[in-house]
């Protein structure tokens, strides 16, 4: 007969994220692309609010995310002010095919600075699968994100591209901000999952992980593991650069793609050897 007790949690950390942006930028599409988790709000009154939970893997830890879409209509700004309390991360979403939605990000940043100051945020350009209708250049959005100290992603829920990666990166930023990263990193014993990830990532460039015959969730975890541990290479503008290489000129880019050769120290005969022919040829 089993004894009743507190239920075992299916996650290690619980984070609350808000998706904000103008209406019709596809925030609901992002939530709908997440296959796991519940879609029912834990609160009785949630008019104008879309809610979903999902669980991601971050360095072998399970992070449960509560995702709230506060809608983008002006009358919901007051709702945003209420739901921003306790938020630990914010995704600023715009539509890359709608210039007006990108220009509206300034207004949302002002709302965040007023009602949720200091909360980590990232900039997300949605509907990358409609790039042929693009109105917001990638470089302009990236420069805007850097100016406002934000990480930048372009995502496509339809193609399942960069959605999980954006949530994973924001989770990492939040946990590092709160010092959680230090809890599990020092003196940890590597799990079997960590060892398998380390073995795969050590011999596979990060831009080739998507081509491995593995489930999407595992490939996403492998990329997250690679970035977190500074292993292998990262992709920048379609080219692979070694994480160990410095920010040098164009000459260093070519060298960064070459494998470093192992250099062995020169061998010499033992000094106390009495044989006259003790030499290394």
From Swiss-Prot:
Protein residues bound to Mg(2+): 46, 69
Keyword Disulfide bond appears in the UniProt entry: no
- PROSITE patterns associated with the record: RAB, SOCS
Q: What is its EC number?
A: 3.6.5.2
Family matches, as CDD domains: Rab40 (cd04121), SOCS_Rab40 (cd03742)
Regulation of protein activity:
Regulated by guanine nucleotide exchange factors (GEFs) which promote the exchange of bound GDP for free GTP. Regulated by GTPase activating proteins (GAPs) including DAB2IP, which increase the GTP hydrolysis activity. Inhibited by GDP dissociation inhibitors (GDIs).
Lipid anchor positions (S-palmitoyl cysteine): 273
Lineage top rank: taxon: Eukaryota
Please report the stretch or stretches of sequence annotated as the SOCS box domain.
175-228
Q: Which SMART domains match?
A: RAB, RAN, RAS, RHO, SOCS, SOCS_box
Q: Part of which pathway?
A: Protein modification; protein ubiquitination
Give the membrane topology.
Answer: Lipid-anchor
Gene Ontology terms, MF aspect: GTP binding; GTPase activity
Instruction: Please give the subunit comment from the record.
Output: Component of the cullin-5-RING E3 ubiquitin-protein ligase complex (ECS(RAB40C) complex) composed of CUL5, Elongin BC (ELOB and ELOC), RNF7/RBX2 and RAB40C. Interacts with protein phosphatase 6 (PP6) complex components ANKRD28, ANKRD52, PPP6C, PP6R1 and PP6R2; the interaction leads to ANKRD28 ubiquitination and decreased PP6 activity. Interacts with DAB2IP; DAB2IP acts as a GAP for RAB40C.
| NCBIfam families (alphabetical) | small_GTP
Tell me which family the UniProt entry assigns to this protein.
Belongs to the small GTPase superfamily. Rab family.
UniProt remark on domains: Switch I, switch II and the interswitch regions are characteristic of Rab GTPases and mediate the interactions with Rab downstream effectors. The switch regions undergo conformational changes upon nucleotide binding which drive interaction with specific sets of effector proteins, with most effectors only binding to GTP-bound Rab. The SOCS box contains two defined motifs including the BC box that recruits and binds Elongin BC complex, and the Cul box which interacts with the Cullin family of proteinsto form a ECS (Elongin-Cullin-SOCS-box protein) E3 ubiquitin ligase complex.
| Protein name (database record) | Ras-related protein Rab-40C
Q: Which organism is it from?
A: Mus musculus
- What is the gene called? Rab40c
């Amino acid at each position: 007969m089993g004894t009743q007790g507190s239920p075992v949690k299916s996650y290690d950390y619980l984070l609350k994220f808000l998706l904000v942006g103008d209406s019709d930028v596809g925030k609901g599409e992002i939530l709908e692309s997440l296959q796991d988790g519940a879609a029912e709000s834990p609160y009785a009154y949630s008019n104008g609010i879309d809610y979903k939970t999902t669980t991601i893997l971050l360095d072998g830890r399970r992070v449960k995310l509560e995702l709230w879409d506060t809608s983008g209509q002006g009358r919901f700004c007051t709702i945003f002010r209420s739901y921003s309390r306790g938020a630990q991360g914010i995704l600023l979403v715009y539509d890359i095919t709608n210039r007006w939605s990108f220009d509206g990000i300034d207004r949302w940043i002002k709302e965040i600075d007023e009602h949720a100051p200091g909360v980590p945020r990232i900039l997300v350009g949605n509907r990358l699968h409609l790039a042929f209708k693009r109105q917001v250049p990638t470089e302009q959005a990236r420069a805007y994100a850097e100016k406002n100290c934000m990480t930048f992603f372009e995502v496509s829920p339809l193609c399942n591209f960069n959605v999980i990666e954006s949530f994973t990166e924001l989770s990492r930023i939040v946990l590092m901000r709160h010092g959680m990263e230090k809890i599990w990193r020092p003196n940890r014993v590597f799990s079997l999952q960590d060892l398998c990830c380390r073995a795969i990532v050590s011999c596979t460039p990060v831009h080739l992980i998507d081509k491995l015959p593995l489930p999407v969730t595992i490939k996403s975890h492998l990329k997250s593991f690679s970035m977190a541990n500074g292993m292998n290479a990262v992709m920048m503008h379609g080219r692979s650069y070694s994480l160990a290489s410095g920010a040098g000129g164009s000459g260093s880019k070519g060298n960064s793609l070459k494998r470093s050769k192992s250099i062995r120290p020169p061998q010499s005969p033992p000094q106390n050897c009495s044989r006259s022919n003790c030499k290394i040829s």
